[in-house]
Amino acid sequence: MPDIDKAVAKFNLNEYYDQALNLIVSGRARNAFDLKQEKDKTRDLYGRNTFGQSCLLARRLVEAGTRVVEVVWPKVANSDNHSWVVHQGLEARMKNQSAPMLDQGLSGLLTDMDQRGLLDDTLIVWGGEFG
């Protein structure tokens, strides 16, 4: 019996596999990806940029029943996504780009989840490459 099969048998992971598959095929998670279903006011709360809309998507996935959601902030070429890694022009980029995006996206997520009663059962962790 391969190691993964032993782990499944030992920890009864089949139930988790079934839940994950059901989440995907049921359409709940798939529908969560359609941000156009949100009101403009809600989308604006998070910020109309890659990070802000990713935070909104995270909230929608939690509402859809997703148990673990991760929002990453990579550098994306030719986009509004300025990334958190700044090696040149630190002061200007942090003040004018990265910090405002973070502030609006994360505070929008916390505000929206609180208004919907989702913070009672949700752990949100924010961290950077140095903690």
Please state what every model-predicted region is:
Residues M1-G131:
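Ligand-binding pockets and gating/stacking loops
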